[in-house]
Each structure stands twice: as structure tokens, then as C-alpha cells.
């Protein structure tokens, strides 16, 4: 074994302690605000490093995606199985104005619906909203027994599945094309589209647990501050009142 100096050992004076720096001393808190589509707009808080030199805190925050439970945003436990994704688009003081970035089911809710003796039917469409957002919508449904059915299973044939998928795609395409992203999200909260899809397919095969399972944002238009402020209820479409113009008076004599 060679004996020599170990360069990795740092020489230090005895009695000196290493200075402990609090990592939170260089950070600051920001409040996350949800769009006015939801009842509770206070989502929570987030941390970011303070602006220093060429690094700006607002640039770091823009584009940050947070996830919130719809039950917290609506104040009702009936929506606890839905997760809403919000994207930070603008920084105003200590407030972060967000826009809708997507929606999904919780894993436990999705797994609890999958059972034996029934058929799982899924459909998806890629559509552009009226405000130029390209989204992909996923729908899910399960077959159920017919009234007074004795047979244990309720499997659907391939022709039934294709017909149900076609109806789902037509309804979702129509609803998305005729709505903005915020309007389409507001339709998902009371589950209006789910009931429409279930009623439209009851003549093909009886269904249960019909849901819009997921909404994925694929492409967004160019950022517009006015539309974001209107989404948060801070903008106005009023252009103002018309005022009478000033007319020059012509003097008869000079």
C-alpha cells in the first residue's frame, strides 16, 4: 500500500463550522389563479427563484403546468375523480393567471369501472375548437345488462362497438367545434355531454359509466392577453361611448 498525500482531503482549520444557507431565502411565493370557469379560483401557491441578473422569475414561471383536483375547484366531492391541468400564461404581480391545459381521470376511478362480464368501448377524436385550440378528446363507456336479462354476461358485438364509436365521434366533434376551450370544459363539469352520448346510443346497446375520460391539448394559438384577461373575468368587451367631435368656428371678421 502506497503512503502519500490524499489530495481529496481538504485542509481546514479546527473549530470552523460550515456556513448553512437556507435554500428558501432566495425563493419567493406566487399565488396560482384558475380561470373564472371554476367556482374556486385560488388553486394554491408555487415557489420560484427570485429574479437575479438576466434570469427573470416571470420567464421561469410562464409555461409551468400545475395539476388540481376538480373537487377543490368546484367545492364539491362529486368531482373528486377528475384532475384539471392548468398552464401559467401570464404573471401579474404575485398572481399567476392560468389557462386550461387538459383534463384526466384519477387512476383509482378508471380502474374501478373496469369489471368482468362487460365490454369496454373507447373512442377518440382530434378536433379544433372555435378559438383555434387543437385538442384530443377520449370517451369511454361500458355495456350493461338489458332489463329482465338472465344471462350473466353483456358483451357487445363488433358491429355494435363500431356504431357506438361513430355516434361518440360525431357528438364530440360537434360539441368541440361549436365551443371555445373554456365553454367545452364548462360542459364537462355537469356531464351534459355524457348524458347525450348515453341517450344517443341506447337503441344500439344499453351503456353505463359513459364519460369523457381525458382531454389532451395538442396545439394552442398565439398568446393573446385580451382573451386571457376575459377568461379570468378581468376584461371587458365594451368599446366605450361615442363622443361628439370638436368643430372649428369660422369668424366672420378678423
UniProtKB/Swiss-Prot annotation:
Keyword Cytoplasm (UniProt): yes
MF-aspect GO terms: structural constituent of ribosome
Keywords assigned: Acetylation, Cytoplasm, Ribonucleoprotein, Ribosomal protein
Signal peptide location: none
Modified residues (N-acetylalanine): 2
Domain of life: Eukaryota
This protein's name: Small ribosomal subunit protein eS1
Species this chain originates from: Zygosaccharomyces rouxii (strain ATCC 2623 / CBS 732 / NBRC 1130 / NCYC 568 / NRRL Y-229)
Gene behind this protein: RPS1
Amino acid at each position: 500500500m502506497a503512503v502519500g498525500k490524499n489530495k481529496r482531503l481538504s485542509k481546514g482549520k479546527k473549530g470552523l463550522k460550515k456556513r448553512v444557507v437556507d435554500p428558501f431565502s432566495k425563493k419567493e411565493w406566487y399565488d396560482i389563479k384558475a380561470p373564472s370557469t371554476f367556482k374556486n379560483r385560488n388553486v394554491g401557491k408555487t415557489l420560484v427563484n427570485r429574479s437575479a441578473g438576466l434570469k427573470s422569475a416571470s420567464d421561469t414561471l410562464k409555461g409551468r403546468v400545475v395539476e388540481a383536483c376538480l373537487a377543490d375547484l368546484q367545492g364539491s366531492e362529486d368531482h373528486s375523480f377528475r384532475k384539471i391541468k392548468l398552464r401559467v400564461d401570464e404573471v401579474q404581480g404575485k398572481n399567476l393567471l392560468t389557462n386550461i391545459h387538459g383534463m384526466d381521470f384519477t387512476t383509482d376511478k378508471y380502474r374501478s369501472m373496469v369489471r368482468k362480464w362487460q365490454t369496454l368501448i373507447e373512442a377518440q377524436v382530434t378536433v379544433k375548437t372555435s378559438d383555434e385550440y387543437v385538442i384530443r378528446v377520449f370517451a369511454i363507456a361500458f355495456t350493461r345488462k338489458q332489463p329482465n336479462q338472465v344471462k350473466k354476461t353483456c358483451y357487445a358485438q363488433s358491429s355494435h362497438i363500431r356504431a357506438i364509436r361513430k355516434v361518440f365521434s360525431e357528438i364530440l366533434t360537434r360539441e368541440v367545434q361549436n365551443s371555445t376551450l373554456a365553454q367545452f370544459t364548462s360542459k364537462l363539469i355537469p356531464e351534459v355531454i355524457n348524458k347525450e352520448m348515453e341517450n344517443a346510443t341506447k337503441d344500439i346497446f344499453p351503456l353505463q359509466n359513459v364519460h369523457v375520460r381525458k382531454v389532451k391539448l395538442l396545439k394552442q394559438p398565439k398568446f393573446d392577453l385580451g382573451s386571457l384577461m376575459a377568461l379570468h373575468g378581468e376584461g371587458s368587451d365594451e368599446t366605450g361611448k361615442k363622443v361628439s367631435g370638436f368643430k372649428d368656428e369660422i369668424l366672420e371678421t378678423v
